[in-house]
Amino acid sequence: MDKAWKQRERQVAKYFGGQRTPLSGGNGKISRADVIHDTLFVECKLRKKHTAITLWDETNEMAKKEKKTPVIALCEKGRPGFWVMVHSDDLDKI
């Protein structure tokens, strides 16, 4: 049976229409990404807890009360632009 992180990498690869990189990203001969894809460089991180996901959980609770889709914009001082965090189940809603 695969380890949990390998299963997650396969799940993410399938979602994006790619394939899990054998031997994991760092050791891969094709790409250093965790997922082999024509245009995306996908890195997967399976952790017990992610700070950004804790923030998403809090935002999701507030969004549910207003019947809205939660979206988080992560910004860093001194860096232009922002990163968008949306749950994979919600991507088709935005």
Q: Where on the chain are the PLM-derived regions?
A:
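Catalytic phosphate/metal-binding cores of nucleic-acid and nucleotide-processing enzymes, i.e., regions
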Residues: M1-I94
